[in-house]
Design a protein with these regions (language model features):
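N-terminal glycine-rich, Lys/His-bearing helix-loop that initiates the first secondary-structure elements
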Residues: 1-34, 433-522, 885-904
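Conserved PLP-enzyme active-site core in the AAT-like
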Residues: 438-441, 515-518, 522-536, 540-780, ...
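Acidic, proline/glycine-enriched N-terminal capping motif
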Residues: 1-89, 97
Length: 904
């Protein structure tokens, strides 16, 4: 080994613990330890792997010139990074090739981009080249600090399913000390008892969904390394060398400079856009101005658009990206190695850039409860730089020293979207691949009908007689509501709209609709009374449709003065993040998608999440919220959550926005708490909400529908907006607005107005009793104990990281139906730590405080004691069959008989 080879601070530790050392990029690094590459790969995928990556280069960039400099020398948009975020990026040359790929981390805690501090991490083998390249281009950028911090700042990575739990054990303040549970987030934290400060980032180079990189002072890094292993070794965590790091990144389809980036086998530049994973790392935001390689990369981008849109391309010789990097699964026996030729139809179409045999754990089950078994397998995979015209499914051959290996182009080898595990992806006809379905024999319709009815009856009896339903978004309607919902209007149409020429009279486009006209008028009056408002729209058939109509209506309203131009979207929206319990329908991935603008700075949907308290992530941080409101000036604020245990700060936010020049629309989506609207919970219009939407079937007594309510009457500020929203409902959203359930909703509204005081008081009291009882039973209840853990119908308990689905399944087997729920610190629903429960349905079936105390005892025995109690729960449920808070059974019975006589 050369004398000038460099060593990380952990070099001696590696040697003392069985590290097989090799020279890599000028560094003396472990390629593997005693367990070997295969075991290190498997341990990372099932448990966690610990990597020394201090050999990588770390450059500090700060000062007023930092952003202009980074915008010029990197492909991504540095301005898109808010503090505590990171992004994958590349250092491009003028020809559209990569000098290197890199990661950029924003370290500061401020909001001003001019005060930002960045850390740029580059590949070890390219560090000196990158340093020289970047220094050559820093001239002309004033007030710029550009320093090499590689020696003083160490870097290690902890990757794999157990990584989160291990860090929680060594960090102060437990899970709240970790970064937010989304990719590319970072946070400064401290080792418990050691006073060692470290920056933790949710990034990595393995494809693991649970991934962390840690930046620590070099003189403290061994202490952190050993602390992690001391906690994790007994659970399967191992140190991992460069060998398994390479097989892990290859299985994840990630590029390696010198293989998938840089120069190809002929010495030509590999276009940056040839590698799929690099495309999101290139930004053409106008905020970047002119930057290195912009024109060349724009040409690559335009050609890729033509290809993906299946539009005519230039002749092959004139194409900028004639070859691309594709994942190829080897279907025959053998291993594809770097440099092997790839053939199709006898002709060479490219070569293998990376290839090996990788091990994998087998997942015998499917779905949310699937976990890796003890059985393992191996598969040969490769990344190949081959003809751009190929698509997934194409068959190719790889020349293994004169022997043809069969392969197939695939989309990917690995899936990381279901934390905590990364799962191997197979295709049919390959080893381990999914099996095709079996053809079904023909069955008589009468037999199918009998089977269907049998299953429906069985399920109805089980759900209505034997199970305790604690799903917070469900509620069984009364018999009268159910039967009215299937009367004749269920089969009819009654389209109508208000016509000004007829004095705002509702004009119906069908005959035979007088009942529906009467029903809608009565329903509107009942709901106006319930909400204490002037306007209601009842034709929406779900809460999501209600939200869509409001978003669409607001966008139309914002464009009302100039309808000749392309309509602009809502500039900015403030809402609850989905991972913090926000409604799916209020997200850019939900109903908001087509109506919110893209922020030109972040290049993401222009949505600002409510900040939450560190000590209570279920509670909005009102101090930070006010700062963000004045910083961003949103045009719409959406309150309301699907995981809602507190009152929403309607009045407080109304106060905050009252002095703004351009006031945002304050929208409260009460989906879960619509049936609690009143003095025991919240009265949104009295507190300052502009508009309320909701579902009528969660805490409200109705069948499954939606509603929109407001005080936007004629003569008010938002009169025009309300008219537009009504038009966005019809004809914008519905034609047939499900008339049967509309009839049922009127009956439910009668019940709600008659019994709301008692019901709302009892639901909230029962929820508090249930929460305290669960706590007394030794279960971990989320929420503020000073508020009784909840102010709504919902109760949330934490059952262990990733254990929510399994515990929910165990409870279902014991006739208790709950909803597994990701906690605010969970990465996804697949890693859910919590159970979300609601007491509203069982309260309506007559359960009281003492009954919820008993239920808490049963749940303790099932969750903690792992006892089987299905029969006991079934007997317990049979005490609560008769529905309350509705017309008494004696009065309802003759009405039910009359309805049964006509619907038979």
């Amino acid at each position: 080994m050369q004398n000038n080879v460099k060593k990380t601070v952990l070099n001696l530790w590696h040697k003392e613990h069985g590290g097989q050392m090799v020279e890599f990029g000028g560094w003396d690094m472990p390629v593997q330890y005693g367990k070997g590459i295969i075991e290190e790969h498997l341990h990372t995928r099932r448990f966690a792997g610990l990597f020394d990556i201090s050999h990588m280069g770390r450059f500090l960039v700060e000062g007023e010139g930092a952003n202009p400099f980074l915008q010029y020398v990197l492909t991504n948009n540095a301005l898109a990074l808010e503090h505590g975020m990171a992004q994958y990026t590349l250092i491009p040359n003028e020809y559209g090739g990569a000098v290197d790929d890199a990661y950029l981390y924003r370290l500061d805690e401020g909001n001003l981009s001019s005060e930002a501090r960045y850390l740029l991490v580059v590949n070890a083998a390219n560090k000196d080249k990158d340093w020289a390249w970047l220094n050559d281009r820093r001239k002309g950028f004033k007030n710029l600090t550009f320093e090499d911090r590689s020696e003083e700042l160490g870097m290690i990575a902890l990757q794999g399913p157990l990584a989160k739990g291990i860090l929680e054990k060594i960090l102060m303040k437990g899970h709240s000390a970790l970064p937010d549970p989304w990719r590319n987030r970072l946070r400064v934290s401290e080792i418990e008892g050691e006073k060692i400060e470290l920056t933790i980032s949710r990034t990595g180079y393995t494809g693991e969904p649970i991934c962390f990189e840690l930046f620590v002072r070099a003189d403290k890094i061994q202490k952190v390394w050993e602390s992690i292993l001391a906690i994790g070794e007994k659970d399967g965590v191992v140190p991992v060398g460069l060998g398994a790091r390479d097989t892990l990144r290859l299985e994840a389809g990630l590029p390696l400079y010198g293989h998938e980036l840089g120069l190809d086998s002929e010495g030509k530049e590999i276009p940056i856009f040839a590698a799929p994973s690099t495309r999101p790392a290139v930004s053409f935001s106008p905020l970047k101005g002119e930057w290195t390689g912009k024109d060349a990369l724009r040409q690559q981008f335009e050609e890729m658009k033509l290809r993906l849109d299946r539009l005519p391309l230039p002749h092959k010789e004139k194409q900028i990206i004639p070859k691309r990097i594709f994942p190829v699964a080897i279907t025959g026996q053998g291993i594809a190695r770097q440099g092997y030729d790839v053939l199709k139809d006898g002709g060479k179409i490219g070569y293998v850039t990376s290839g090996t045999m990788v091990p994998y754990w087998k997942f015998p089950d499917t779905g949310i409860l699937s976990r890796p078994a003890e059985e393992r397998g191996k598969r040969a995979i490769a990344l190949c730089y081959i003809d751009s015209d190929l698509e997934a499914g194409a068959r190719v051959q790889i020349d293994q020293r004169g022997r043809a290996l069969e392969g197939v182009v695939v989309e990917r080898f690995l899936s990381g979207e279901a934390p905590p595990y990364a799962r191997p992806i197979f295709i049919p006809a390959l080893p381990g691949g999914p099996k095709h379905g079996v053809e079904r024999a023909a069955v008589k319709m009468s037999e199918s009908a009998e089977r269907l009815v049998g299953r429906a009856v069985q399920n109805n009896l089980w759900r209505q007689r034997e199970t305790i339903n604690l799903i917070p978004s469900e509620a069984t309607p009364s018999h009268l509501v159910s039967l009215l919902s299937i009367t004749d209007p269920a089969h009819r149409y009654a389209e109508h709209r208000s016509i000004k020429a007829f004095g705002e009279k509702e004009v119906f486009y069908y005959q035979g609709t007088k009942l529906i006209e009467e029903i809608e008028e009565l329903l509107a009056e009942e709901l106006r009374q319930y909400f204490g408002c002037t306007e209601v729209e009842t034709r929406v058939i779900s809460g999501q449709m209600a939200n869509t109509a409001v978003f669409s209506g607001l966008m139309d309203y914002l464009n009302r003065l100039d309808r000749k131009k392309e309509r602009r979207r809502i500039r900015k929206v403030m809402n609850h993040h989905l991972g913090r319990g926000g409604h799916l329908s209020a997200q850019p991935m939900g109903a908001l998608r087509d109506y919110v603008a893209h922020d030109p700075q972040t290049e993401r949907p222009a949505v600002i999440a409510f900040p939450t308290l560190r000590e209570d992530p279920y509670q909005i941080d009102l101090v930070k919220t006010e700062e963000l409101l004045h910083l961003h000036g949103p045009e719409m604020i959406i309150l309301g959550k699907s995981m809602i245990i507190y009152k929403e700060p309607v009045a407080e936010i109304r106060r905050m926005i009252s002095g703004m020049n351009s006031k945002p629309l304050l929208h409260y989506d009460m989906a879960h708490v619509l049936g609690l609207s009143g003095p025991f919970y919240q009265e949104p219009f009295m507190e300052g909400a502009d508009i309320v939407t909701g579902s009528t079937h969660k805490t409200f007594f109705g069948p499954q529908r939606g509603v929109i309510a407001s005080n936007m009457a004629e003569g008010t500020e938002y009169e025009d907006l309300w008219e537009i929203i009504v038009r966005r409902v019809f004809p914008g959203s519905v034609s047939n607005h499900h008339l049967g359930t509309l009839v049922g909703l009127l009956m439910a509204s009668y019940e709600m107005n008659a019994y709301k005081q008692d019901f709302q008081r009892d639901v909230i009291a029962n929820a508090k009793t249930f929460a305290r009882s669960l706590k007394d039973m030794g279960l971990m209840v989320e929420g503020n104990p000073e508020l009784g853990y909840t102010e709504t119908h919902q109760v949330i308990i934490r059952v262990g990281y990733g254990k929510g689905p399994e515990v929910a399944q165990r409870l279902e087997e014991n006739n208790i139906i709950v909803n597994y729920q990701s906690a605010p610190d969970d990465e996804a629903f697949t890693a859910a730590s919590c159970l979300r429960m609601g007491v509203q349905e069982m309260t309506r079936f007559g359960m009281e405080a003492k009954d919820f105390q008993q239920l808490a005892e049963y749940m303790k025995e099932i969750i903690i004691g792992n006892l089987s109690m299905a029969e006991e729960i079934s007997r317990f449920r049979k005490k609560f069959i008769e529905m309350k808070y509705c017309l008494p059974e004696k009065e309802a019975a003759p009405l039910i008989e009359r309805l049964l006589a006509v619907v038979r």
